[in-house]
């Protein structure tokens, strides 16, 4: 993912946690907030409680892939943070994908395809 489409700075994450809308589901938490850009930006966080670096990276890769597969269905102009939970590692791909779509629907991030 290009740097322009990722959230990297600490202040960006803090702002999202304080002022962004959130939805909690089985294996993840999604925070979102409208940005003034014409594209979405993504940040992914994994708690130290989940395990060591190999576990962190696996959870991060799974969330990044779920986002990539569904990015065409999302409205543009939002910053999003995906927070991995314990079930991120054990859930099936279908379950993880369904959870992501359900949380995005709850936050009204999915484009209306009428």
Question: What are these language model-derived features?
Answer:
Residues 1-114:
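Positively charged, solvent-exposed patches that mediate nucleic-acid binding
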């Amino acid at each position: 993912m290009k740097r322009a489409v990722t959230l990297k700075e600490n202040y960006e994450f803090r702002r999202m946690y304080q002022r962004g809308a959130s939805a909690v589901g089985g294996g993840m938490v999604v925070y979102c907030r409208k940005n003034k850009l014409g594209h979405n930006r993504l940040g992914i966080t994994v708690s130290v409680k989940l395990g060591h670096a190999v576990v962190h990276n696996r959870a991060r890769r799974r969330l990044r892939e779920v986002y990539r597969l569904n990015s065409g269905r999302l409205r543009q102009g939002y910053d999003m943070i995906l927070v991995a939970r314990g079930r991120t590692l054990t859930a099936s791909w279908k379950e993880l994908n369904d959870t992501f779509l359900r949380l995005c629907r709850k936050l009204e991030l999915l484009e209306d395809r009428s």
